[in-house]
């Protein structure tokens, strides 16, 4: 059966000498794996069209199991996401988080909206690292956990100015008054905890101007990755490249 669906490539894996297996997140919020034959050959024209983040109309044959890609009518190549390694790696982290949050057969229209929103924001100049934080905050429940940043997990104190870190012992933010009860709590700036709470709760269609200091973004990114590792046992492939790039900067 010939299928035509708009979608965004969220995963691309080389298969053999000349083929690729791509996964698109289609406009209905479903993951669709496709075999792209000879996609690594320049003459086929599919090499550029099967890159990560390509948004287009995908035409493919689908019978049982994996479909076979025929062609792609590209709507947006998202070139800006490919031009900078840091931007590309954090955009990949966002895409990988969404892809791994979904089981085969899941339908999640919100994930498609979230991915479109994030890629458009990055293209317009918003920090890709910040956008990866937004995605990971929004996808937490799909990985089976949540995190609270707006009240002390020990005392219930919700005075934001008193919160000084995150406690894995008590599974939540911790206040300075209770800090002695967990000497291993991850110390975070008050602003980091506040913004994590805001971004977690704020609908994406209300996120207009996102101008946050880099030190705060770094803190948010680090604690979010720790949460995923501790609560969901997740280590993302994109994170390996990010860690390598950070080491090169030092």
Curated annotation (Swiss-Prot):
Instruction: Report if keyword ATP-binding is assigned.
Output: no
The entry's keywords: DNA damage, DNA recombination, DNA repair
Q: Has UniProt tagged this entry with the keyword Protein transport?
A: no
Q: Which domain of life is it from?
A: Bacteria
What's any one GO cellular component for it?
bacterial nucleoid
The processes (GO biological process) annotated in the record are: DNA recombination; double-strand break repair
UniProt xrefs under InterPro entries: ARFGAP/RecO (IPR037278), DNA_rep/recomb_RecO_N (IPR022572), NA-bd_OB-fold (IPR012340), RecO (IPR003717), RecO_C (IPR042242)
Function of the protein: Involved in DNA repair and RecF pathway recombination.
The family annotation for this protein states: Belongs to the RecO family.
Protein name as annotated: DNA repair protein RecO
Q: Which gene encodes it?
A: recO
């Amino acid at each position: 059966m010939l299928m035509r669906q708009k979608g965004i490539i969220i995963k691309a894996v080389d298969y053999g000498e000349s083929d690729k297996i791509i996964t698109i997140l289609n406009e209905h919020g479903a993951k669709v794996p496709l075999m792209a034959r000879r996609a690594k050959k320049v003459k086929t024209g599919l090499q550029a069209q099967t890159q990560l983040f390509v948004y287009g109309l995908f035409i493919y044959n689908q019978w049982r199991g994996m479909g076979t890609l025929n062609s792609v009518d590209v709507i947006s190549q998202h070139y800006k996401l490919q031009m900078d390694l840091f931007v590309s790696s954090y955009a990949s982290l966002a895409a990988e988080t969404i892809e791994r949050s979904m089981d085969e057969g899941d339908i999640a229209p919100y994930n498609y909206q979230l991915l479109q929103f994030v890629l458009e924001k990055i293209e317009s100049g918003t920090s890709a690292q910040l956008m990866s934080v937004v995605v990971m905050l929004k996808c937490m429940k799909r990985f089976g956990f949540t995190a609270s940043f707006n009240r002390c997990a020990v005392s219930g104190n919700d005075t934001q100015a008193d919160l000084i870190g995150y406690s894995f012992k008590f599974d939540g933010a911790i206040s300075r008054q209770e800090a002695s009860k967990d000497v291993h709590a991850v110390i975070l700036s008050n602003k980091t905890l506040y913004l994590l709470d805001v971004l977690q709760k704020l609908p994406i269609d209300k996120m207009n101007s996102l101008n946050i200091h880099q030190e705060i973004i770094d803190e948010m990114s680090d604690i979010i990755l720790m949460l995923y590792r501790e609560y969901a046992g997740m280590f993302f492939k994109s994170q390996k490249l990010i860690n390598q790039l950070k080491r090169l900067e030092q």
